[in-house]
Amino acid sequence: ELSYFSTYIPIKATDFDKVELYRLKEQAQKVINEHILSTHIAVMFFSDLLKYKVEFSDDDFETLKAFLKIEFKRMLRKVGYKNFQDIDFKSVDELLVALLDVCEEMHYEASDYCDRIGFQNEGISPYMGSLCSYLHFLHPLLTKFSQLHSIPSYLYILIDDADNLNTTQKQVLNSWVYYRLGTNISLKISTQMRYNVYLTLSGQTIDSPHDYSEVNISNVYTSSKNKYKELIHDIVQRRLVEFKLPNTNPNDFFPEYKKQEEAINKIYKYYIKQFEEGKSRGSKKFDDANRYSRPDYIKELKSSSKQGSSYFYSGFNQLIHLSSGIVRYFLESSTYMYSEMLKNSTKKEIEFISPTVQNKVSRAYSNEFLFEEFEKHKKTAKLRGYSSDNIRYLRNLIDALGGLFSAILLSNASERRVFSVAISNEPDELITEVFELGVGLGYFQISTIGNKEGTGRTRLYVMNRRLAPVFTLDPTSFAGYKFLRNEELKLAILDPQNFIRSMKKKLSLNVEEDLYVNDQLELFEE
């Protein structure tokens, strides 16, 4: 039994960003935006109580009836709502529906007002509806429910994709965080890295850890060898069971390409034998086998095929790595795979996703990330406040680093599985901006490592492994990282092909130069 009750608020599934509100004065925008957010969350909360059929005790029912007759009516008078009528409720559900209806009516008062003023060319009629706030409406309302015995005392408001809120709405949300009223009511806010507003409505800043605790989910998952893998395994297994599919083992449902794995295993055994004969680079029996068997296989494919496209991205474990610590990536690509199998199958039930389909969809999903989604970023750059030049530089940077990582994979370096770069000297403003844009758009993840001199720490930028198929890289680990100078990265964003040629030349002279291994960065190593 859970110790909390949560309500999920997906911002992407709302129409909060009312452009008509920009016609109002700044203070009016703030007040109406807070009202829209507050009433929407209240509506979702009561909808969830009804949806999940929460059973309330008789004592709680009496408590709620008394609350509606006195406290709730007083709250409604304060926010300007005058249509509430006393009703002799026969059941808790009837009472919850009444609460839901009131909150929904107040929400649409403001929403409809925004739509109407969009048609007013001259002068704007004043808003005459109710105005709810977090402090005087939403928080006391939720607090009352947290005091009941029939539901857990901790209520979590899960606000997803908060980066999609407009600037004023982010300030509203920041103000709620700033109040720090989280004894029983806790705000859990998820956002992409592009959430860039940390001011409240009154101009105060919110700071971590003073006002909130911040967790980078990608860092949590990608820094653990088992946590993310176990999470995906549990999610997939539950879904396979729920849909009553004949095969509920994720490893069997997403099988490896047998011919490929047999060839890699043959190379793996070769390196084990080399160790036993005292001819290995690594100090442990499985070091070389883990490091080189898959890169060597890809290298062999590259030598026999110009594109190297016969490498298969298949198998449950490899698909987990391709998702780069982001659950949505795994589930979305899996959905495409299942649809592809249904389209080409004569059977009523899908027993497994064939390696061919896994590989086909994985490559298409990777291409979509780099090509189609990048085109969207180009078209919306101005609207979202991005520099169009920086969008172009970011694309060049990805191409340049993808080419560099591919060259390292095909080299004789001691560590060929490289997905990360660190900057060995001080990056200039442009390089910093381009990397930050890449992090914000999900093409890079950010971490830290010890600097080259061993005197402190520096930022490490990890390329999203969803891009691995574009460059035919091994996604199953990223133990190595490459130090690059600011001047080299400047060449990468301006002329990626010249950068790749320059890096290949350096690799041919000294393959180990500025190439390092960090065991803490290994992901799901077997």
Regions found by a protein language model. Give the residues of each.
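Glycine- and acidic
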Residues: 27, 123, 155-160, 218, ...
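Alpha-helical repeat scaffolds in large eukaryotic proteins
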Residues: 46, 139, 143, 178, ...
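The catalytic "switch" region of P-loop NTPases
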Residues: 116-123, 130-158, 165-306, 353-390
